[in-house]
Amino acid sequence: MKYGSVCEKGKRPQNQDGMLVRMDSRYMPLAAVSDGMGGHLAGDAASALSLQILDENTRCMNIAPQDMLARAYVLANDAVLEESHRDPYKDGMGATLVSALFFPDHFIAANVGDSRLYSFKQGVLRQVTYDHSYVQELVRLGYITKEQAKHHPKRNLITRCIGSSDGPFETDLFYIDWKQGDSVLLCSDGLSGVLEEEDIQDILSQPYSPQIQCEKLAALALKKGSTDNITALIVCNDEEDTCS
């Protein structure tokens, strides 16, 4: 597998996004993106802790991968919640967390929040994850359109996050087949919130390396007016330098 990544603060004074790529042959390959929230001190701490707990708890080879991934999310939620209670400066902190464990012919994805995972197969982009957000619920119920959601005053309000104490914690899990030449994009809403799917598909269709694809996506997001941190992480099921 090949991968590339960009994680930058964009037009924000501080970067509260985080990302993780684990390609250690001793463990299952893992990729993840987390977008922290909770103020100057807390946002980056929430995303960093979420990724740390995810990494530490997805290394066991004796547990069904989907169960291990779901358990890691619960532990990450507990850890972020505990830290927010321990440190008054981090009160109310939280984070999104989207991730994927990779296997030769499939991957298992998990998501909480509005960071996204897209699959790209044979020139076609598909959003795999479902945004846990207020506006996505309005779209699902038919109250607003996808286009209206982009400009809604509550478009940044998420309904699930790592660090939540509201009711039973739930993680969305997805089992997706993938073949040689397929790729996966994990990103924060600093990217997906401003780029159309056609924009992303066009760049992933070009014969660039995953790193160049990520850089082009981030540059286009800035050009289109992103005011948030921007993270793009592409994993390609290919041994070649390019992926398309």
Question: What does each model-found stretch correspond to?
Answer:
Residues M1-S244:
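PP2C/PPM-type serine/threonine phosphatase catalytic domain
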